Curated annotation (Swiss-Prot):
The gene is Emc9. It comes from Mus musculus (Mouse). It is found in: Endoplasmic reticulum membrane. Belongs to the EMC8/EMC9 family. One of its GO terms (cellular component) is endoplasmic reticulum membrane. Component of the ER membrane protein complex (EMC). EMC8 and EMC9 are mutually exclusive subunits of the EMC complex. GO terms for molecular function: membrane insertase activity. This is ER membrane protein complex subunit 9. Its main location: endoplasmic reticulum.
């Protein structure tokens, strides 16, 4: 399988989701352009799903349907799944992660499964705190690290560090939050704007 590129937005929101609920397992969906071509799968965004109702299939169905509709309007498809376990030193995908990732792969064969490495989830990690897996046959196996690309790793790590220091993770909304209060925006447009402004300010200082 080909290269995977992880954008600052997708990476940032995964980390902020895990940081908002550090003692809970969290999960979410990874999005890519529907018109993507070539060998590289570009993960441009993600949608945080749950921190307390991970195993409830009814809520998962509701979330998947809403993300599918919203993604189609934005020209995006569900291209992967991310998961952070509740246990600090556990980076292995459990049955739930494998089940959801497998379902996504049925509709998008190039889908990836990203496990967050909790031990490396610090403010500014030296190396990306992610383990990217790809579907080979009936198994999810670690992807060659040389095929996992970053649009700008240094920018991504600095951005997440700045957002965490500014406590932006407290404003992240996942589907659990939305289902508790439908006024809360699970697309996280406020956070997207912060990420865009941060990236723009660093470009301007370059």
């Amino acid at each position: 399988m080909g290269e995977v590129e992880i954008s600052a937005r997708a990476y940032g929101k995964m980390c902020l989701h895990a940081s908002r609920y550090p003692h809970a397992a969290v999960n979410g969906l990874l999005l890519a352009p529907a018109t993507g071509s070539g060998e590289c799968l570009c993960l441009t965004d993600c949608v945080p799903l749950f921190h307390s109702h991970l195993a409830l299939s009814v809520m998962l169905e509701v979330a998947l349907n809403q993300v599918d509709v919203w993604g189609a309007q934005a020209g995006l498809v569900v291209a992967g799944y991310y998961h952070a376990n509740a246990v600090l030193d556990d980076q292995s995908p459990g049955p739930l992660a494998l089940k959801i990732a497998g379902r996504i792969a049925e509709f998008f064969p190039r889908a990836v499964l990203i496990m967050l490495d909790n031990k490396k989830l610090v403010t500014r990690p030296r190396v990306p705190p992610v383990i990217v897996l790809e579907n080979q046959g009936l198994q999810w196996v670690p992807k060659d690290k040389n095929l996992v690309m970053w649009r700008d790793w240094e920018e991504s790590r600095q951005m997440v560090g700045a957002l965490l220091e500014g406590r932006a993770h407290q404003h992240l909304v996942d589907f659990d939050c939305h289902l508790d209060d439908i006024r809360q925006d699970w697309t996280n447009q406020r956070l997207n704007t912060q990420i865009t402004q941060w990236s723009g300010s660093t470009d301007g200082n370059a």
